[in-house]
Amino acid sequence: MSIDLTNGPVTKKMMLFSLPLIAGNLLQQTYNIADTVIVGRFLGADALAAVGSSYALMTFLTSILLGLCMGSGALFSIRYGEKNEEKLKESIGASFLMIAAVAILLNGLVCRNTGWILEFLQVPQQVYDGMRTYLEVVFTGILATFLYNYFASLLRAAGESLIPLIFLAVCAVLNIVLDLWFVIGLDAGIAGAAVATVLSQWISGIGIAVYTWGRCPQFRLRRRDFRITKDTFGEIFQFSFLTCVQQSVMNLGILMVQGLVNSFGPIVMAAFAAAVKIDSFAYMPVQDFGNAFSTFVAQNYGAGKQERIREGARKSVLLVLGFCLVISASVFVFAKQLLLIFVQPYETEILAVGIQYLRIEGVFYFGIGFLFLFYGYYRAVRKPGMSVVLTVISLGTRVVLAYVLSAVPQIGVSGIWSAVPIGWILADIAGWIYYKKLQQR
């Protein structure tokens, strides 16, 4: 059922829309984590390091497509708020052609350059073969990732967040079952875990595409809608390209940090791989709430309801702050227990590094929570360039400080972890200053 975010109680409408979004991405994290848990438990620390380190690279690559889909989704939401069906269909057809072309190009580039990419990331020899095997299989699912994210963005733009959740739930359950079958039942190793992920992605991507075209007449396009005019290209470029840049810069920074982590060896790599999974799972709800907030703002921006946007912003800040305080306390207290999901109790060195990471970064989840709200807001009010600026501040600070601090012998690897919240908070300050300037105009 689609939710009209331009009318009715603000908090209730945002929560009804965001909860399936949050549940969906928690499921997505669950099936991402499934690879890591099963590989770490049954194939050992080197395999865990290989699969966990692959996650940073895959996140960077898929962030390009995700950014394009998110940017298009903001435009779809504005068109939906304007009740302009003709313009909406033009935007859908043109953006599909543009993003599909990028997905095909990206798939070809990464498949041909896997070896060079691993060398750039300074992957240790003992995990090189496993990481290459995993990536070569997982890369075949890039087009499936495009299909799911594109049609999920389209449905969410119309206030429909439950259907994407259903397809993601099927994908998550299937991935876990196939992981167990390939890795344990068939003894297929790292390649088996990758095949399980790819099969699940294709089923989810094709399924949601068929549903959207078949069951949503407002999105059923005519042949003439599949064309790219100068005006349509300009609008999609404005939203999608800058959102893509923002997502790519964010994940490129993470990828550069991954390269630095790799230089500390397999123990730190394995700890980082496990801790990042926990980290992502912990703040995923506020990331999804930020996306829901973006849809809320975009629909009301299209409808010209500025006061409703301000009310939604105030209430969203309080909701995010409350959630982050609870999650930060939980991660700090239960850091060891959470890491034991991924590693064995006797792997004490990995546990020590992972606990250090979670307790330094986890205290500051409110920083990333507010940042996701700023990202969503600026994307929705046609200021996606500001999201890029905030990302550059956050990730630039993180990367520079990570390299500088970790080079100090007395600080070492903990400097990489400390750089993260500093970047978040500096970006939040910049986002708030610009928000106040916009309100004064």
Residue map of PLM features:
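Short alpha-helical transmembrane segments in multi-pass integral membrane proteins
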Residues: M1-S18, F76-G141, G185-F241, V297-F364, ...
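N-terminal transmembrane alpha-helices
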Residues: L5-F42, A56-G71, L75, A100-N107, ...
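Transmembrane helical elements of multi-pass membrane transporters/channels
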Residues: L16-D35, V137, C171, S200-S204, ...
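Small-residue hotspots at the loop-to-helix junctions and early N-terminal turns
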Residues: A45-A56, L135, A194, P266-F281, ...
